[in-house]
């Protein structure tokens, strides 16, 4: 019996597609549900971030952004909101958090076991796109020695929440101690008889 060979060629049809059996039109790939589409050429995402809400632009890059009143400008401001910043100086510890979507009565700041917990929640509200509800919880560890009763919070008119705590003053520790020398008065000797 003679061997029968069927030649195989990739060009069996002019519209050859290597993944035609793999891709189904009903599948959604690379979708970010609930987030507005923002062209990526307006700014550069940081290399280690997969979520657009965690980025900060350099001052030189802010000129490349759309105007705040435009639809893309509003979407970009919503993506960049919620950023917190922790600062510690010699005498205080401070957290600043953007909570502009929440009213003061929707925010709770409390301390427990050397942890500051900030919670914000508002029920379903109507906006220009439909209904939306938001909630978040952020926890920050207080530096050692900070009194929980000394923690204070304030909300600015533009929606920036600041939580501050004074740091304890360190006791002065020195390896060299000066010991004062006291001079005693000379005792008079009793007269000899």
UniProtKB/Swiss-Prot annotation:
Residue list for modification Phosphoserine: 15, 80
A Gene Ontology molecular function term of the record: protein kinase C binding
PROSITE patterns named among the record's database cross-references: SHSP
Tissue expression profile of the protein: Smooth, cardiac and skeletal muscle, hardly detectable in fibroblasts or focal contacts.
Pfam families (alphabetical): HSP20
Entry GO terms, CC: contractile muscle fiber; cytoplasm; intracellular anatomical structure; mitochondrion; nucleus; plasma membrane; spindle; Z disc
Keywords: Actin capping, Chaperone, Cytoplasm, Cytoskeleton, Nucleus, Phosphoprotein, Stress response
Subcellular location: Cytoplasm; Nucleus; Cytoplasm, Cytoskeleton, Spindle
Primary localization class, coarse: cytoplasm
Family classification: Belongs to the small heat shock protein (HSP20) family.
Full protein name: Heat shock protein beta-1
Annotated organism of origin: Gallus gallus (Chicken)
The organism's taxonomic lineage, starting at the top: Eukaryota, Metazoa, Chordata, Craniata, Vertebrata
Encoding gene, per UniProt annotation: HSPB1
């Amino acid at each position: 019996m003679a061997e029968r060979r069927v030649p195989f060629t990739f060009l069996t049809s002019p519209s050859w597609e290597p993944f035609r059996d793999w891709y189904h039109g009903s599948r959604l790939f690379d979708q970010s549900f609930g987030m507005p589409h923002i062209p990526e050429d307006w700014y550069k995402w940081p290399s280690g971030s997969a979520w657009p809400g965690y980025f900060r632009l350099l001052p030189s890059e802010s000129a490349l952004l759309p105007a705040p009143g435009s639809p893309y400008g509003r979407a970009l401001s919503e993506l960049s909101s919620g950023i917190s910043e922790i600062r510690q100086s010699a005498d205080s510890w401070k957290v600043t958090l953007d909570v502009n979507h929440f009213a003061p009565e929707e925010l709770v700041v409390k301390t427990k076991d050397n942890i500051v917990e900030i919670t914000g929640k508002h029920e379903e509200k109507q906006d220009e796109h439909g209904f939306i509800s938001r909630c978040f919880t952020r926890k920050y560890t207080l530096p050692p020695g900070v009194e929980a009763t000394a923690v204070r919070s304030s909300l600015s008119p533009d929606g920036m929440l600041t939580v501050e705590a004074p740091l304890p003053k360190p006791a002065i520790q020195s390896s060299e101690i000066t010991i004062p020398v006291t001079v005693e008065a000379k005792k008079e000797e009793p007269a000899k008889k």
